[in-house]
Amino acid sequence: MRNGEVTTINGAWNEESNAWVSEIWCLTGDCWLEITLPDKGRLVIKKAETLDGPWPKAKITTWTGPEFRIRIYGSTKYRYVRIYLTEEPVRIQFANTKGYAVRSL
């Protein structure tokens, strides 16, 4: 994989957490995760964590419509984040400093 690319995302509904759980792996640089929901309902991120525990630096920016952006800062250890959402997304897109990759669930 080339420098700056974003790897695939995994996601599934987790009954124990009562949340949609997604794992994001970003190889290098700052990364953004954009989430689109099935309707214009409110997205709630129940928690975000890294391999070392809670990730308090998750910055959420609301866009127009049902889209949300989460920035994964370059200081995030291992460039890995697991997020817990209150709704299952219909689309997840990635952007980073080296390009754009799209994954559909």
Residue map of PLM features:
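Glycan-recognition and processing domains
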Residues: 1-26, 55-58, 93-105
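Residues marking helix boundaries in flexible regions
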Residues: 10, 36, 61, 71-73, ...
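Extracellular and analogous surface-interaction loops
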Residues: 20-31, 37, 70-76
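Secondary-structure transition/turn motif
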Residues: 24, 48-49, 86-87
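Noncatalytic modules at the cell exterior or secretory-pathway interfaces
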Residues: 30-32, 73-90
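Short proline/glycine-enriched turn/loop motifs at strand-loop junctions of beta-rich domains
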Residues: 37-43, 86-89
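Short, surface-exposed beta-strand/strand-loop-strand elements in extracellular ectodomains
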Residues: 40-54
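Extracellular carbohydrate recognition and processing domains
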Residues: 55-77
